Regions:
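Short, small-residue-biased leader/transition segments that mark boundaries at the very start
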Residues: 2-7
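Glycine-rich, often proline-containing surface loops adjacent to acidic residues and nearby aromatics
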Residues: 25-45, 113-116
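A short secondary-structure junction signal
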Residues: 45-48, 72-73, 128-131
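Long, contiguous, structured domain-core segments that constitute the functional module of a protein
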Residues: 8-31
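Residue-level marker of positions within ordered structural domains that often coincide
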Residues: 39, 65-66, 123
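Acidic, metal/cofactor-coordinating or nucleic-acid-engaging core segments within structured domains
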Residues: 12, 20, 49-84
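Polybasic, proline/glycine-rich intrinsically disordered low-complexity segments
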Residues: 80-152
């Protein structure tokens, strides 16, 4: 996706950058990094939204750090709220699905790192996935541009 359409990828690292710390030689850190591409068209304050996205990524990464949950493609994440995930809480986006980022898995000096992309989804889409009438993979196909769009 070109930079004219989205704010460049935001990435939250859960890998090892400077030295090997975990005992698994095949995996760098937790073995994945979270990415998110935010559609910039229609954003009132893009800089504020970028800071807010970084806070959301940090909160989501905390699930891994605190509970050991591994985010992989094909999952959904209900954020437990009915208000939007944008900075003003006005968006219909209340959760995320995961898919493999276009970059995929990379080899680092400290092991493999899979880039897992988060795509913002609406409450009704989360409900469809909870009720198993739609899968995250099916929704990712519908949202094939991979952008989190607060205006959809």
């Amino acid at each position: 996706v070109g930079s004219e359409m989205c704010i460049r990828d935001r990435t939250y690292g859960l890998s090892e950058l400077y030295e090997k710390q975990n005992g698994n030689p095949e995996r760098s850190g937790y073995g994945f990094e979270l990415t998110l591409k935010l559609k910039k068209e229609g954003l009132e304050n893009p800089a504020l939204e970028v800071r807010h996205i970084c806070s959301l990524l940090q909160m989501i990464a905390g699930i891994t750090v605190n509970n050991g949950h591994q985010f992989t493609p094909g999952q959904f994440l209900a954020m437990g709220q009915q208000r939007g995930l944008d900075a003003a809480s006005k968006s219909a986006i209340t959760g995320f699905i995961t898919k493999e980022d276009d970059i995929g898995t990379v080899e680092s000096p400290f092991g493999k790192v899979q880039l897992v992309q988060l795509i913002g989804v609406k409450a009704e889409e989360i409900e469809q996935m909870k009720n198993k009438t739609m899968t995250p993979a099916q929704l990712a196909e519908i949202l094939k541009d991979g952008l989190t769009d607060y205006k959809r």
